[in-house]
Amino acid sequence: MKKRRKILKFKKHMDKVLNRPSTQEPYYTNMHGINSWYDHYNAMLFDNKLPYFDEIKIKRIHGALGQVVYTTYKTKERMYVLEMLPKYPTKKMFLETLVHEMIHLYQMKIKNNTGNHNKLFYSFKNKLNFLGLELSR
């Protein structure tokens, strides 16, 4: 019951955030925003089991809103890098992109899955819809 209350409280918070007039204005990505929202989503969606990205880059990306890039070294250890755009048309788009990439990290690092847009990926769709966010490709 405690977790349910926590989720409902977070939903109320998300509703407030998404209904602010400033949410429809361009959002400039910053490390504080990424880390703060990462912690919120990690607690609500992943029970704080999702590790942090090894590195976070704010950069221009062609043909994508964000991406998780991984490199494998000789030790077979993978490094996961989150790449986000410097500017998004709206804050909602930033939030949806961040949680989208977090799901990919969850697939690859926790579930040892491919990280594709598959059944595991789309299993988060209802949770995000409940919070007022969309999960898309």
Label each residue range with its predicted role.
Residues E101:
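Walker B catalytic acidic pair
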